[in-house]
């Protein structure tokens, strides 16, 4: 299964790179699928197939990878607009609402996505769900001095919340902004992502949460059909 998932991720990353045009300012996402996209971009720049590209990264991980591939970078504050942002997601529901933040980068990811003229999400088919938060926890970035208070208020919404602990250091995960992350699980999942995003962000001490609502223009889905990896494009319907 792992090999099939890798094939799906590679296929969708390659499809995303095909959307990149000369002269673009790009939002470069975080996570395993976005990393494959960044590698593909680096290869096309090195070969001369693409030129005059500038990237804006969403994490320290992406910044290091892009620098290794000699992709020119600018900070978010240094650009007036982003032509195209490409990023992964942890879950995508039928309304194109997302949960992101498995890598604790969702604050910068949301800033970049909001600045972009087009926001394209790249996922493998395992990330498509009927309802958010039934499988993947919702990350909430909080000020270190407020995490207990925020935890209580998240649990008052109906569910549980736990401080995310680091895997290879003692203590909690610390974000690129120096904050902590609470992972929330709501009873029955998230029925109204739009309302919940605002409700959580109104809690004092919360910097941002991992719900990305009404921001995605296209979802590229890597999937296996008859043993072969392919890509399906889901376009948002205009209301």
Swiss-Prot record:
Q: List the GO molecular function terms.
A: ribose-5-phosphate isomerase activity
Q: Which UniProt keywords apply?
A: Isomerase
The UniProt subunit note reads as follows:
Homodimer.
Q: Which PANTHER family match?
A: RIBOSE-5-PHOSPHATE ISOMERASE (PTHR11934:SF0)
Q: Which GO terms describe its cellular component?
A: cytosol
* A biological process from GO: pentose-phosphate shunt, non-oxidative branch
Q: What class of enzyme is it?
A: isomerase
Q: Where is the active site?
A: 109 (proton acceptor)
UniProt cross-references to NCBIfam families, sorted A to Z: PRK00702.1, rpiA
Name under which the protein is recorded = Ribose-5-phosphate isomerase A
Its pathway, per UniProt, is: Carbohydrate degradation; pentose phosphate pathway; D-ribose 5-phosphate from D-ribulose 5-phosphate (non-oxidative stage): step 1/1
Which first-to-last residue range defines the signal peptide? none
Q: Which family does it belong to?
A: Belongs to the ribose 5-phosphate isomerase family.
Q: Mind telling me which CDD domains this protein's record contains? A: RPI_A (cd01398)
Give the highest taxon in the source lineage.
Bacteria
